[in-house]
A protein has these predicted regions:
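Hydrophobic/aromatic residues located in beta-strands of well-ordered beta-sheets
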Residues: 5, 46-48, 93, 123, ...
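Short, high-confidence coil segments that cap the C-terminus of an alpha-helix
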Residues: 43, 88-90, 118-120, 217
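N-terminal glycine-rich phosphate-binding loop and ensuing alpha1 helix
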Residues: 2-49
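A conserved hydrophobic position in a structured secondary element of the catalytic/binding core
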Residues: 50-51, 103, 185, 232
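Conserved alpha/beta core of the MobA/IspD/sugar-nucleotide pyrophosphorylase nucleotidyltransferase superfamily
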Residues: 88, 170-242
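Conserved core of the sugar-phosphate nucleotidyltransferase
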Residues: 104-196
Length: 242
């Protein structure tokens, strides 16, 4: 099985412009993500996908593989364009978030391994939520899944809704999980989901994976114990343990 790792990267972000090129202890964010991804032995190849010349040149300078794409609304669409245009073809594409400079290669391996099951079309990771602050944070996407570990729903709001219990009992009555924003797709499925129309639920929650669920695509969810730290605003860099 040939697995392609793609790191979609755009320069402009509403909360952190130029994020991929921000310096983190002497290396750009995109370089740190790329180097972590390269440590995953299950990836046959790793590319950065961008529509920005500055990011392209930066990746070339540190010796990484990079391809220019057209503008896209999502990293998923950017991954699809790159995967379809490469001469070499891959069975699975892993969409690696470009704002997680400390991503653990074991998380990528954990996700890639799920595709040894031929029934896995799309896959992602989740980690149990332990605090009320994290549960109530709208930047933390929550996921619920069935007994076979297929996603039932994603939301920026707590699911299931814990408000019928006092706050101190929330974690007694339910397990809550946050979505780790790394995806794997079979290459043919990636192409299919990028041709789907946006749905109203997707627009409301600003979560593209709801479009896939509403179109009956199954998303396998694997629980991980490994923490994930995304950089949403500049002050998040101070929290990194480098």
């Amino acid at each position: 099985m040939k697995v392609l790792g793609i790191i979609p990267a755009r320069y402009n972000s509403s909360r952190f412009s130029g994020k991929p090129l921000t310096d983190i202890a002497g290396k750009s964010m995109i370089q740190r993500v790329y180097e972590q991804a390269k440590k995953c032995e299950l990836l046959s190849s790793v590319f950065v996908a961008t529509d920005d010349d500055r990011i392209f040149e930066s990746v070339m300078e540190f010796g990484g593989q990079v391809k220019m794409t057209t503008e896209h609304n999502s990293g998923t669409e950017r991954c699809n364009e790159l995967a379809q245009n490469l001469e070499e073809k891959f069975d699975v594409v892993i969409n690696i978030q470009g704002d997680e400079p400390c991503i653990n290669p074991e998380q990528i391996s954990q996700l890639a391994t799920l595709f040894s099951d031929e029934d896995t079309a799309i896959a992602t990771l989740a980690k149990q939520i332990k605090t009320a602050n994290e549960l109530l944070n709208e930047n933390t996407v929550k996921v619920v899944f069935d007994e076979n570990n297929f996603a039932l729903n994603f939301s920026r709001f707590p699911i299931p809704d814990p408000k019928s219990f006092d706050a101190e009992k929330w974690f007694v009555h339910n397990n809550f999980y946050k979505h780790i924003g790394i995806y794997g797709y079979r290459t043919r499925v990636l192409q299919e989901i990028c041709e789907l129309e946006q749905t109203e639920r997707e627009k409301t929650e600003r979560l593209e994976q709801l479009r896939w669920l509403e179109n009956t695509y199954k998303i396998k969810v694997e629980e991980t114990e490994l923490e994930s730290h995304s950089i949403d605003v500049p002050k998040d860099i101070e929290k990194l343990n480098l």
